[in-house]
Every structure is written in structure tokens, then in C-alpha cells.
Amino acid sequence: MSEHQDTATNNNTTASPSATAAPMPAPISQEQPSSQPAATTPAPVSTSTPPASVTATAAAATAAVSAPQANGTPPSDEQLSCLWQGCSEKCPSAEALYDHICERHVGRKSTNNLNLTCQWGSCRTTTVKRDHITSHIRVHVPLKPHKCEFCGKAFKRPQDLKKHVKTHADDSVLVRSPEPGARNPDMMFHGAGKGYAAAAHYFEPSLNAVPSQGYAHGAPQYYSSHPPHQPSNPSYGNVYYALNHGHDGHASYESKKRGYDALNEFFGDLKRRQFDLHSYAAVGQRLLGLQNLSLPILTGGPLPEYQPMPAPVAVGGGYGPGGHGAPVYHLPPMSNIRTKNDLINIDQFLQQMQDTIYENDDHVAAAGVAQPGAHYVHGGMSYRTTHSPPTQLPPSHAVATTSASTSMSNPATHSPPTGTPALTPPSSAQSYTSARSPISISSAHRVSPPHHDGGSGMYPRLPSTTMADSLAGGYPTASSAAPPSTLSGIFDDDRRRYTGGTLQRARPEERRPSIQMDTSHDGKEDGERTPTGKARSSGSDSPVRISANLIDPALHSSSPSDAEAALRTAQAATEVADRADSQWVEKVRLLEYLRSYIASRLERGEYDSDSDDHASAAASPVIKHDGHMDGVESSHKPITAEETSAPPAAKAESNHGVMYPTLHGLDGDEDTKMHH
């Protein structure tokens, strides 16, 4: 009886699984005929759910198998065959295959077995360098060592990776990324090591967007932000929405960064003397590149090196730095004006450019300051052109020769009072004795003529001191005495030599006999004898004519159309001159802004003092050596601690007691002579 009960119990326990599992496929079998009538799969197999540990193990195994394949390395049991012509060697990995091809089949020039033609399969690509053929071989070998930091995709060649990275980049990434080769994006953003995947990097675009991945919080180069904060929910990163005015701030940063870089490059060209500082055309062309940019210094005040950026809004439980103020971005320091010496040199170069702009021949001549062709500079100006003296003398020069006070108060040639005159008079004009040389005569006196007792008509008298005496003596005004430091006045007016390249008016023709004064009828009154202006104009067909063969055809106007054409030409020339003047003013203002910026940095001490200290320390021995003007070679030896601690008197005694006492005595005599 008990055995029967045990058997029944065992039967019930064995039947219980089927009994419990049997009702489950019933609803499935009712739904399947409508969509899959031929499905006869047993229910327990299709509805079984594996445990979580089994799923994790399978995923890990799949990742372990797929990772080597992504990098181009096959499993250990798989061999890679070399398909080079005439080679059947097998390599365990793609890297080994690549090394085999480079060393065995390509070879090297040093070993005299260099092969620049690819013989992989049917490929017959030929290159000119070994680097090119080795780069081409990567196409055939499944080696992908270059991995994308954003999506994890691997590539065979670095240029392929570079093209792929551009697909991830947007405008904000291109602006924020530093110079090429400085740092890769993974080093700039330090959030990859905080538990997020390498593909979770998110670059905030210029427009409003919601990222699908976590935001790797970090600060790129020249950006400052608050310390990262781990969110409460570990499955989500910090997600930021850009505000509506973020695009405007982004564009402002772009323009300022562009102008900042252009200004730094301009300072670098100045340091390296890339263009001629004394050429007006070269200076103007170089400044034109800066005028079209929005330089930060043109806004007034010192150059700002940081600007606030719009604060992002944090969502999803992340950390929002907006509550502590907007973060700021820092412009990189200018590498070409880091030290004090750089600032001083740049200021000197800018001054040379300023002198070149101010001394431009065209603008100085247009302003009436100097005319090309003559050796004269207006006395009222504080500068003169070095390459183009004026053509004609202004009225002030003629007046300067009439009186002593006017002529001596107007420094026409800018000559020193006790030095050699700027323009020495010719020997034929005036003759000086040793007592009456231009240097010995005081500037307060004038040259007085010598008094002769006998009236010798062979030599003319020198001009007298006053205007009345000179007129009474029969000498013209132009031949009056000039100051001893200036050119004599005998070459003025019409007797002065004409310079070439100038347009001169033709001499008018002789008067016609019909308009000459009639003196035959003496009995008539004056009104009848002398023709009036009206009669003279009516009697003549045309006014005083100038011979046509002496006039430039371009200056001859005989019809209204020619007059209109001349008027249009004059207007166009005026517009060109006005435009040139405005450009000249812009160049002058830009140079003034640049010099004020350099001066402000020098005043505030905004430069790297460490490099200046090193430079001065390195240059001090040379300066000290140049300062000793002894005239004999001196041997330099390192200074020991004993010599440093010794008093100056003991050093002097030791120096005088050694070597050359006689030479030191000579040096002392020379110093005494120099002081006297």
C-alpha cells in the first residue's frame, strides 16, 4: 500500500511540470494561426527566459570577439596570407603582415632593395617615395590602428580618420578647437575617464539642440568653467540647452578671435621685417588687411583678453553653472609681444611706419608743405621729406630775404646756429674771408658790404643792409643779402633754374598791328586817340591767342563736349583724391591705436618679466665687456667667491699691481684728457 502511494506520488511529481506548462501554449496556439499557421514550435523552448548572468556573459564574449576584428586583428586560430606576387607567407596578425610587406617586399634604399611598385594581387600602383608606398599598403592590409575618439570607428590611414572626424564636427567645434597639432579632442575634454564611454562626447552646437548621449563635462583650452558635478542619476549626464542669444555671443567671439589672430600675425611680421617699413605702398597694403577686421583695440580702452559667454541652462538633474555667474572665455596671449623688449621693438617699428605714412610725397605735396624739385622746406613745419625737396619757393622765402628780423626768425633750412649751413652758397655768389665765414658770423648780424674808397667799376658792390639802400644802389630786390646759413637770393624769381617734368605755359603771340595805339592824329582828344577796351575787343576777332602748335592737345577745349569731358575727368580725379585721403587718414588712425595699445601695455606692465630677466642676465656680460674702452685685450676668468667677497679697494690694488701698470697709467691719462 505504501509502495503504491510512493509510486503515485512520483507520478504526480513527474506529471506536474507538464501539467503546469501545458496551459501556457494554449493562448499562443490560438494567436499564431492568424499570422503563422505553419508554426509548430514547442512552447517550452520558445518561452524560456535565460537568466541575467547568462546574458552578461554572452555580451562580454561578443565584445571580446568583435574588438580584435575592429582593430584588424583576426582571432588566434585564423592566419592572414600575404597576397604579394610570388609570396604565400601567413602572418598571425595584421600588424605582422604589414611589417612583413614593408620589410620583405618594399625594402629600403639603404639595403639596395627598394621597390616602389605595389604587387599585391593585381594592383600595380607605383609611387615615388617609400612613405607613399607604405601608406598605400595599408589599403590592402586589414590593419586599422587609427580610431575615432567620438564614435569608436577605426581606420587604416590617418588621412581617412581626419576626413571622418570632419563629419562629427560643427561650427562650435571648429572654433573651440586649438591650433592643428596642439591637442587632440580627447585630451581637451577630460570627461572620458569619469565612467562615460568614449563615444559619449558631445559638442554643443550653435543652434538649440538636445543631445542623445551624455555630456562629457570638461573645459577646453582657453575656457574656464565651474568644477564638474556628478548628477544624482548616474544614467544621465549633464545636458545643457543654449539660450537664444548664444549664437550672437558665438559670432562675436569668432570676429574678435579672428581680429586677435590677425593682430598677432601683424606683430610677428613686424618683428621678422617681412615688409619694407620705408615703403608707403608696402605699409599701406599691410595695414589694409587689418582695417577690414574688427580689432578689439578699436573699441577704445585696453584690449580685453576675456569676454563673458551666455550661461547655459541645465536640465535633467545635472549641474547648472548659471547660478554662479556666466563663464568666461579667455583669448590666448599674443605670442609675438610677450616680453618687454618685444613691446619696445614693436613700438619703434610702428613709429617708422608712422613716419613713412606722414612723409608720403603725394600727401605732403598736396598739403602745400613741400613741392618736389627744389631744395627748400617750409619753416613753419616741424618735419621735412627726405627724398623729395620742393620745386618752387613759397612767398615766405622771398620775404625772408628782405629784412634781418624776418629772415633770421624763419629757420628755412633747419641748420644749427653754430654748425655748417644746410646749403652752402656757391663761391661765385659771395666770397668770405676767414673772419667772415658763415660759421664765425653771429646769427644776430648780417653780412655788411666792404667799403671801398675808389670807385672801381670792375666788381659790383655787395648788397646793403636795408631795402632802401639796395634799391638806391640799383640792385633788384631778389639780390638782397640772405642770411649766412641760407642760399643766396640772386637765383630767385625768373632767373632761377627751371626743373624738368613741369608743364609751362607758352609765350603769347605778339600784338596785332590793329590793336596797337594810334599816335598819328595828335589833334584828337585822348578818348579818340586811344582806343578803349570795348573798341579793342570789338576790333579783334578773338582774345589774345596762343599758337596752337605750342599747346598740349589734351588741354585744348574748343567744344562744349570737350568741356564736359574735362569736367568729368576733374570730378573723377577729385573723387580718387578724396578716397586716397580717407584711406590715408584711416592708416594714420590705425597706427595711433596700435601705438597707444603698446604704450598702455608697457605702462601696466602686461608682459612676461621672466624672459626679460633671463635676456638681461645673458646680455649683461656683453654690455659690461663693451663698456671697458681700454684699447687692449683683456682675459676674462670666472669670478670666485673670494674675489666676490673682497672689498673694491683690494680689487683695485690687485688690478694695478698685476700685469700692465704702464697701460693703466695711459688709460688714466686718456681719461684725464677726455675730461679736459
Swiss-Prot record:
Bias type Low complexity, positions: 7-23, 32-55, 394-413, 476-486
GO biological process: cellular response to alkaline pH; positive regulation of transcription by RNA polymerase II
Mutant lacking the gene: phenotype: Leads to defect in both contact-mediated epithelial entry and protease expression, and significantly attenuated for pathogenicity in leukopenic mice. Results in hypersensitivity to cell wall active drugs such as caspofungin.
MF (Gene Ontology): sequence-specific DNA binding; zinc ion binding
Region of interest (Disordered), residue spans: 1-55, 380-545, 605-676
Localization of this protein: Cytoplasm; Nucleus
Post-translational events: Activated by C-terminal proteolytic cleavage by signaling protease (probably palB/RIM13) at neutral to alkaline ambient pH. Two consecutive proteolytic steps are required for pacC activation. The primary step is pH dependent, mediated by the putative calpain protease palB, to yield a 53-kDa form, pacC53. PacC53 is a transient intermediate, committed to proteolysis by the proteasome, generating a 27-kDa form of pacC. The truncated form pacC27, containing the DNA-binding region, is required for correct regulation of acid- and alkaline-expressed genes in response to alkaline pH.
Gene Ontology CC terms, in alphabetical order: cytoplasm; nucleus
Basic and acidic residues: compositionally biased ranges: 506-531, 605-615, 623-640
Keywords: Activator, Cytoplasm, DNA-binding, Metal-binding, Nucleus, Repeat, Repressor, Transcription, Transcription regulation, Virulence, Zinc, Zinc-finger
Zinc finger (C2H2-type): 80-105, 116-140, 146-168
Compositionally biased intervals (Polar residues): 425-445
Keyword presence, Oxidoreductase: no
Motif (YPX[LI] motif 2): 660-663
Listed InterPro entries: pacC/RIM101, Znf_C2H2_sf, Znf_C2H2_type
Extent of motif YPX[LI] motif 1: 459-462
PANTHER family to which the protein is assigned, alphabetical: PH-RESPONSE TRANSCRIPTION FACTOR PACC/RIM101 (PTHR47257), PH-RESPONSE TRANSCRIPTION FACTOR PACC_RIM101 (PTHR47257:SF1)
Family listed: Belongs to the pacC/RIM101 family.
Its biological purpose: pH-responsive transcription factor required for epithelial invasion and pathogenicity in leukopenic mice. Modulates expression of genes encoding secreted enzymes, as well as cell wall and gliotoxin biosynthetic activities, during invasive aspergillosis. Plays a role in zinc homeostasis and represses the expression of the zinc-uptake transporters zrfA, zrfB and zrfC under zinc-limiting conditions in a pH-dependent manner. Binds to the pH response DNA consensus sequence 5'-GCCARG-3' or PR site in target genes promoters.
Record protein name field: pH-response transcription factor pacC/RIM101
